[in-house]
Amino acid sequence: MGSFAKPFNRVFFLLCVLITGSLAGAFVWLFFFLMDVGISFLWQTLPGWIGSVTAELLPVLSQGPFGFVPFPLIVCVLGGLVIGLYAKHTGVEPEDLNSVMAKVKQDGRYDYSHIGKLSLAALLPLLFGGSIGPEAGLTGVIAGLCTWVGDRMRRFGADFRALTVAGTQAALAALFTAPLYGFVAPLSGTADGARGEEDIALPKAQKAVVYLCAIAGALSAFLILGQLFGENSGLPRFDAVEVGSYELMLLLPLALAGMICGWVFHAANKGTMCLSHAMGNRPVAKAVLAGVVLAICGMALPYTMFAGESQAHRLMEGYSALPAAVLITTGFVKCALTPTCLNLGWRGGHFFPVIFSGVSLGYGFALLTGAAPAFCVAACTSALMGAVMRQPIMAALLLMLCFPLKGVVVMLVAAVIGAAIPLPRVFRPNTQTDRA
């Protein structure tokens, strides 16, 4: 009987991993669905209704991209108030993606004691139009849920502690529909460490199978739900990348433009870190200030708001209707706005908005130069991600499925250029301020 128990536990474990991955993918889809429904009501239905009511009394205000001119200011300031008060009274805020993965890699688990509060904290800034991504808060929630399941399945073997890592990989794979990035990111730069009861007791080959099962389950669930009920978010997909002699001549200038946009991100990150540190423990004041800045940017450049995943698909269809200067300015402003939101209490991720910044920047330069749009987008986005992440291979893995095979070389070269040129010292975060 004992000889049968171990193989049975392994099969049962792999089945649990597949189910866990599927549930993670379904949870990601559901989160995106709720986010889209909430944003649609708050930013389309509601201002449209207000605009129609005030059209006769104040026709000058019943204009603009939201149907009511001061609507972003009202909602973003109200959002800052809600987010700040929620953080102050609950003490719960989503951690950034690096912190989530660091805890999962180091401890093999993630705290799930406030999972419900964390879910709402991850959703609120997105609903109120924050220029942040869903990946950080959502990955933390899924890692916590997987830890909860692993703790309760532990009697079947220590291998069940792998559910947290597998769930994190599954979440990242579904979020970005990037299986290679989802597989590598949570494991990059880590050692096995000392083996013990708390460690994952799986040989390396079997461990890879476990993680791939989780990723397969997550992507399957996410894509199937998207087919059944309508696709929800994910990174944009470009069908073709034309690479001619003219485009190759522009590769370096485009990559440098993306790199400079990445420097803007780092400059804003350091500046708002210092501002946050100077303001001290005032979560409400910080969040309201971020709301005011967000509203001002959104009223002038509407695409600077929101995470950017849905907006990227919209921009693909209608970028030619916008002036090149507006698209390029949007890319730079959004890159500065994202760390501003993050450091002033609108917590979330930065990948989705930064990718959108690269897309907007690329389309702007495509209109300006007449070069192939997908090529410009690939070069600008990859260089921007390389400059922000400082890891060109990881940047390329993240964007791998956005572009066809012909664009991979362009992506790699641009990402290397973006990451290779050292970040100016003045833009590098202060260690003490960062910790504070």
Identify what each model region corresponds to.
Residues 1-436:
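Alpha-helical transmembrane segments and immediately membrane-proximal extracytoplasmic
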